[in-house]
Structures are given as structure tokens and as C-alpha cells.
From Swiss-Prot:
One annotated GO molecular function: adenylate kinase activity
PANTHER family with a match to the protein in the record: NUCLEOTIDE KINASE (PTHR23359)
Transferase found in the keyword field: yes
Propeptide: 1-9
Positions annotated to bind ATP: G25, V26, G27, K28, G29, T30, R142, G214
Catalytic function, reaction form: AMP + ATP = 2 ADP
Protein name, as recorded: Adenylate kinase
Family label: Belongs to the adenylate kinase family.
EC number: 2.7.4.3
Keywords noted in UniProt: ATP-binding, Hydrogenosome, Kinase, Nucleotide-binding, Transferase
Positions annotated to bind AMP: T46, R51, G72, L73, V74, G100, I101, P102, R103, Q107, R175, R186
Family matches, as InterPro entries: Adenyl_kin_sub, Adenylat/UMP-CMP_kin, Adenylat_kinase_CS, Adenylate_kinase_lid-dom, ADK_active_lid_dom_sf, P-loop_NTPase
Source lineage: Eukaryota, Metamonada, Parabasalia, Trichomonadida, Trichomonadidae
């Protein structure tokens, strides 16, 4: 897989290789989708990829289901396998946004090694920081439409009809990993692993931090867009 991917990369320059860094639920996915269209990038969300495996009841999905739903971290090798598979399938772009990876220093090192072999090192690391109490309220109020991936919020972006998708009329769900108990577990995991990642990218001079507390999506987006210009 690696040699095939390297050959595909050699045929087209990747202008932007971007890591979106920050705790689960901070808004990385929302911002990534906006920037994806504007810069012809491809968003790779390891969280979405893992949940797709779970929905498909694949061997991998069955193996990681309990880990994801309890707020744990999937092992680094599995995450990197998923990342490479996503890159292999999507090469017609100007670069990638890595959303949800890296989350450990081991993943940082593996990602650097992979991209070095591709000849396409990271160009930007965008760190979205947020007050944890605000984040808890944001995450534990989320509602999802499984078929499309549309996201609502009980308070800030409610559906027109309670627990019902505005477009299809199908029921919305609350993910099992969006309960207060699992949120606390995920935050414990996150804060136990993220500081070495922050330090690593800071020393490389490619880390940019964007506080997002109380800021509208469009305000944050303008700042991120400017950072990638």
C-alpha cells in the first residue's frame, strides 16, 4: 500500500498537509468541511472512519466498538492503517486535513514518518482550544442524523421538530460517546496524551493556536482560512 501511495503522490504536488488538533467536540469536523471545499483538500476523520466500520459490523468495527463507546483510544497501528487506506482512496486533491489524528505522540511520530516517505511533510497544525465546561455543554447536546452525518444541537442548533432530521424526517440519535460519563473519560484520555503532541509541533514551528470559546463558527473559520492562505 505504501509504495502505491507514494507513486500516486509523486504525480501531483500536495500544497497543504494540515492537522486539526483539539479535544473531541471542539468543532474540528465542522471547520474541516468548510476548508476542504475552499482549498480542494480531502478531510480524513479517523473517528468517522471508525464509526463507519462499526455500523458496517466489519471485523475491525466489532473489535473497536467497545473501545469507542467507552471513550477509550484505539491503538496507533489500527489508526495508521485506516489513515493510509483513506489516503489511498482519495489522491485527487491539493492536500489533506487530518481530523482526529494524531492523538498520541506515537501517532505523531508515525504520521511524520509516513509523510516523509510520501515526500509531503505537514505544513500546518491548527490547534482549536476551548474551555472544558463549554465543551461539555456543546458535546453532550449534540444530535446526529446517521444517514447523512448532519449534526444538530439541543440548544444552539435544534431541529425544527424534536429529535427529527429537518430534511428527511428520519429520527436523530445521541451517540453513546456523547454522554457526560463518556465525555469525562474522553477528556481524561485526551489530556493524558495531548501535551507531548503540542510540544512536538510547537518546537517544529508549525503550531498555530486558535481559542474558540464563545466564538461563532464563521468567525473561527475566517481565522483558519487566513492561516492556510
Amino acid at each position: 500500500m505504501l509504495s502505491t501511495l507514494a507513486k500516486r503522490f509523486a504525480s501531483g504536488k500536495k500544497d497543504r498537509m494540515v492537522v486539526f488538533f483539539g479535544p473531541p467536540g471542539v468543532g474540528k469536523g465542522t471547520q474541516a468541511k468548510l476548508l476542504e471545499k475552499e482549498f480542494n483538500l480531502y478531510q480524513i476523520s479517523t473517528g468517522d472512519a471508525l464509526r463507519a466500520e462499526i455500523r458496517g459490523q466489519t471485523p475491525l468495527g466489532k473489535r473497536v466498538k467497545g473501545i469507542i463507546e467507552s471513550g477509550g483510544l484505539v491503538d496507533d497501528d489500527t489508526i495508521m492503517d485506516i489513515l493510509q487506506a483513506c489516503m489511498q482512496k482519495n489522491t485527487d486533491n491539493n492536500g489533506y486535513i487530518f481530523d482526529g489524528i494524531p492523538r498520541t505522540i506515537g501517532q505523531v511520530e508515525k504520521l511524520d514518518a509516513l509523510l516523509a516517505k510520501m515526500g509531503t511533510p505537514l505544513t500546518h497544525v491548527l490547534y482549536l482550544s476551548v474551555n472544558i465546561d463549554e465543551l461539555r455543554e456543546r458535546v453532550c447536546g449534540r444530535l446526529f442524523h446517521p444517514g447523512s452525518g448532519r449534526v444538530y444541537h439541543k440548544v444552539t442548533n435544534p431541529p425544527k421538530k424534536p429529535m427529527t432530521d429537518d430534511i428527511t424526517g428520519e429520527p436523530l440519535i445521541i451517540r453513546k460517546d456523547d454522554t457526560p460519563e463518556v465525555f469525562n473519560q474522553r477528556m481524561n484520555q485526551y489530556f493524558g496524551t495531548f501535551q507531548p503532541c503540542i510540544d512536538y509541533y510547537s518546537k517544529k514551528g508549525i503550531l498555530q493556536t486558535f481559542p474558540v470559546d464563545g466564538q461563532p463558527i464563521d468567525v473561527v473559520h475566517k481565522k483558519l482560512h487566513a492561516a492556510l492562505q
